[in-house]
Amino acid sequence: MNSLFASTARGLEELLKTELEKLGAVGCQVVQGGVHFQGDTRLIYQSLMWSRLASRIILPMGECKVYSDLDLYLGVQAINWTEIFNPGATFAVHFSGLNDTIRNSQYGAMKVKDAIVDAFTRKNLPRPNVDRESPDLRINVWLNKETASIALDLSGDGLHLRGYRDRTGLAPIKETLAAAIVMRSGWQPGTPLLDPMCGSGTLLIEAAMWATDRAPGLHRGHWGFSGWAQHDETIWQEVKAEAQTRARKGLAEYSSHFYGSDSDARVIERARSNARRAGIGELITFEVKDVAQLSNPLPKGPYGTVISNPPYGERLDSEPALIALHSLLGRTMKNQFGGWNLSLFSASPDLLGSLQLRADKQFKAKNGPLDCVQKNYHIAETTADSKPATVAEDYANRLRKNLKKLEKWARQEGIECYRLYDADLPEYNVAVDRYGDWAVIQEYAPPKTVDAQKARQRLFDIIAATLSVLGIPPNKLVLKTRERQKGKNQYQKMSEKGEFLEVSEYNARLWVNLTDYLDTGLFLDHRIARRMLGEMSKGKDFLNLFSYTGSASVHAGLGGARSTTTVDMSRTYLEWAERNLRLNGLSGRAHRLIQADCLGWLREANEQFDLIFIDPPTFSNSKRMEESFDVQRDHVALMKDLKRLLRKGGTIMFSNNKRGFRMDLEGLAELGLTAQEITQKTLSPDFARNRQIHNCWLIRAA
């Protein structure tokens, strides 16, 4: 009997133990990352040929204590390597682990290599050569604290390399893990199996090989025992012949079918090639189509299983597409696959929540460094009066109602950008804005008292419903989480895409950026104020302070202003403002752009203007500004400075976003100014629910 070890992915140990016992292994003991077991030479070959779950089959050679590099050298040399190596066999050493003595794995591997080579030269035997790429023998050494474990890797390359996959194409899951996913899916061989996101076909190929009794090692061309002195070629050929016979019989007798699809034609062609190399190509139908085109290939039965490893993302901007994908899959399963089973393997349990399905079973496993979960679902059978599956129905209905009303209004007004939904329903606390054929969902970060998992799932539902109601592709939906912050956080960069979208607002054309910043470059609630400025600007010198991207300057210029002066502290936004002006044919000396601290510039300027627009921050304490600013505290002082620049008969339009702002009318009167509130006149139908989004005033000399 040989003492052996089979390694596997974390989470698959018990499944591997069961498999090895079925092959005839005895004394199986599960440990983290694998199974210790015992077996004769035939079982070694059987486990190499037939294990669908083992990553490697290891034959332990010995252990030694390592307190110095000499201890490692002598411990390795104590093994009788001349009884392990065939004459002329090449080898490679894989060394892992460090301690106070062996601080570099390459150094450890070198000491092991020297010990093995010297074991031959001391007996006046030809020294074996090292071949790091394709050795006849692989020696593994693991150093854990002071103990080194030395073993022979009988697999050679990892057992997940079955020999059928095109190794130029990366696979998101190894074949051994794919086999485990199939085994845990609840699928019964002999029933249909479908993968709607099959990629290179690994799940379907592993399932077909299992169902047709085709050994996973049958197509491998190289093994780790080819240079092993104790290798028994006769027994190996018997094991191999048996596997070939069973494969032919299994394929001839199998009657069910497999279905795979993917949106990438190149990947599908690779899947077909892989299936042909695996010997089961005739059993699998591969098609180029995406999940939106998914339909039941057997609507009249029999029932089968849908299995997949759907994509997931780690970046926020990838979530809308992934949420839409999962939501669509869930609805399609409920509407077309009643009576079927569904099994999905994912690194994102949150995304699986978008299916709107309740799992019957779930399993955990590692996919490389990723913690993953596999969830199995049974899809209830549909009846003639079953309603199509929906998601976030209350929200979807409100969005649909708003769209019907506001879309017509926006078209009549000649605007492409408007707020479609503004936390109309408390449980769906988001804002949804339209920018042409794009949509932006802004979610305020929920308070800590709200369960984060529930809040995230609610957001996923909102995204799925928004895509459905608006009928836009996922790549035209942008998701943002907006903290309730002060100062100039809206100027902080979120991304580096640099993608700009041209939109129309009345007679103006403007650039917006939906992804790179918290705000898009266009404050939608100030739309009417900008139009009013355009109507007031003819023949006037216009000043735009805290100008942001200069959209008010564009409207003033198009309204016939004699000149526009646009002032902002940000070089980025001034360059953006210049692009906006040029887009509308406004350039030259009549349209100045000034980068400056607006408050400092205001105190030093000695020019005169007929119309001034100022939309300062509620509060600012920027390092680049010379002082802090509070709009409630400082607005009278601000008006004092503005009055100095205002020509006789001129007008200041003053707006801010401070809730509960109180205009100091007495303070203005002392300056000889009067204020007329025009807030209600500047609120458009899309902001009718949020009357406090800004306040706006016209200020003139008394």
From Swiss-Prot:
The keyword Kinase does not apply. The keyword Lipid biosynthesis does not apply. One of its GO terms (cellular component) is cytoplasm. Gene3D superfamilies: 3.30.2130.30, RNA methyltransferase domain (HRMD) like, Vaccinia Virus protein VP39. SUPFAM superfamilies: S-adenosyl-L-methionine-dependent methyltransferases. It is found in: Cytoplasm. One of its GO terms (molecular function) is RNA binding. Transmembrane segments: none annotated. Keywords: Cytoplasm, Methyltransferase, RNA-binding, rRNA processing, S-adenosyl-L-methionine, Transferase. Residues 43-154 form the THUMP domain. Coiled coil: none annotated. It catalyses: guanosine(2445) in 23S rRNA + S-adenosyl-L-methionine = N(2)-methylguanosine(2445) in 23S rRNA + S-adenosyl-L-homocysteine + H(+); guanosine(2069) in 23S rRNA + S-adenosyl-L-methionine = N(2)-methylguanosine(2069) in 23S rRNA + S-adenosyl-L-homocysteine + H(+). Its main location: cytoplasm. InterPro entries: 23SrRNA_methyltr_KL, DNA_methylase_N6_adenine_CS, RlmKL-like_Mtase, RlmKL-like_Mtase_CS, RlmL_1st, SAM-dep_methyl-trfase, SAM-dependent_MTases_sf, THUMP_dom. Its EC number is 2.1.1.173, 2.1.1.264. It is an enzyme of class 2 (transferase). Belongs to the methyltransferase superfamily. RlmKL family. Specifically methylates the guanine in position 2445 (m2G2445) and the guanine in position 2069 (m7G2069) of 23S rRNA. PANTHER family: RIBOSOMAL RNA LARGE SUBUNIT METHYLTRANSFERASE K/L, RIBOSOMAL RNA LARGE SUBUNIT METHYLTRANSFERASE K_L. This is Ribosomal RNA large subunit methyltransferase K/L. It comes from Salmonella typhimurium (strain LT2 / SGSC1412 / ATCC 700720).
